[in-house]
Amino acid sequence: MLWCVAGLCLCAGAAPLVVGVADMCPSTNAVNVQATYVAAVATAGNTPVVLPATTDRELVARMLAPLDALLLCGGEDVEPRRYGAKPSPRLGKVNRRRDAWEFLLLDEAVKRRLPVFGICRGCQVINVYFGGTLWQDLPSERPGQIAHRSKELHSVRIVQGSRLAKSLRAENLMVNTSHHQAVKDLAPGFRAVAFAPDGVVEAIESDTLPVAGVQFHPERLFVLLGREEFRELFKGFVTRDGRR
C-alpha cells in the first residue's frame, strides 16, 4: 500500500523514521524536551532522538547525518533583529543561543533536503530563517476576536489541496492555541495553508522543500487528548523520501 503526505510518497510498513527533536530550557540553556513531543513521535511509530544544543557547525552536521527528519519545538520568542525589526515593548523572552542553534540545524537540514516540521515557535523559526517576519505581539499589533494564548480551542481553516489538508484529511479542525506571536510576512517560497477565523496564519509549507510548520500544538492534541487525526503529522508528514 502506498500513501502520500507532504507531497511525498511512503510505503506503508516502511522502517521507522529517526526524528531529531530540538528543544532547550529557556532559563539554563540545557536540553529539556517536553515529554509530549517525544511521545508523539514514538507513539506514531517513529524513533525520537533528543538533540544536544550546540553552535558547533561541524557537530551539528554530524548530529543530523543519521536522521530522517527534524522536529523544531515550541518555546521563547525569536530575536526580532533576525528579521530586521526592533524589539517591541511586548516582546517576550528571547534565547539568542537557541536561535543560533536552530538556524544552524536548518542550514544543515536544507543542505541535506532533510524533512523539517516546526511546531509553534518552530513554525516561526522556519518562517524567519527563510526570510519572513513575525507579529511580535498579536494582542497589541493585530488585535482580533480570538485570544491566541488561551486554554480554549478555536477552529482553523486548512487550504484545500495543501499537503497539510491531505495529511490530516480535513479542511476544518478545532485546535489548541498557546502563542502571542505569529507569521506576519510569509517567507519567499512558502505558502500559508491554514488560518484562524481572524486571519492569523496557523500553518505554512514550502513550495519546493519538505519543510512545514504549524502554529498550534498537535503533539498535545494527539498525546494528551487522543486526537488520532494528528498521528499522521508525526508518522509521515515528514518522510525519508523527502531528502532525495
Ranges and model annotations:
Residues 123:
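Catalytic nucleophile loop
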Residues 2-119, 127-129, 135, 139-167, ...:
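N-terminal beta1-alpha1 cap of cysteine-dependent amidohydrolase-like domains
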Residues 177:
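A glycine-rich beta-turn/hairpin centered on an aromatic-Pro dipeptide
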Residues 194:
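Conserved catalytic core of two-component histidine kinases
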